[in-house]
């Protein structure tokens, strides 16, 4: 009887620890978090706080963001926006924060686009390893449908690509500025990638 009680208590403890184990990502005000694991997110923040937080399950995650430091020049606020950055990391039960260089002018902050010298650190000030890339297409910065372009990026072999979430993204209805949805764009994308024989089979299937 005591053994069963001990076993039950142990299972309850393990369940409790498993349920409470998670990642907390702290996002400063100068970071524009666009997507997490290919989805838009809502951050938790308080009225007087300069940071926001996001809870994630333990494991591998992909974040997409811009770095937008703000500089005061007279009565004006000058914002320097970086290119869109894709990053993939793995963590377990850690509080993670962004760390960026300290820039004292907009001109110096523009160097971030070249250096990409930021870090992720946990609650013990230890570095969280990550892979990163700019979300660009043929050298041009993406501006319209980030989720669609990210879905294409995730089909590549880049170390920052996030394979496991592709199906979720390609089936989600997301309208872009031209009124096209992501499913339609993905169909066009894969049609262009296919050989002639596959294209003919596709056209036959949709005409029947």
Swiss-Prot record:
Keywords: Signal. Residues 1-21 form the signal peptide. The keyword DNA repair does not apply. InterPro entries: UPF0319. PANTHER family: UPF0319 PROTEIN YCCT. Belongs to the UPF0319 family. This is UPF0319 protein VSAL_I2129. It comes from Aliivibrio salmonicida (strain LFI1238).
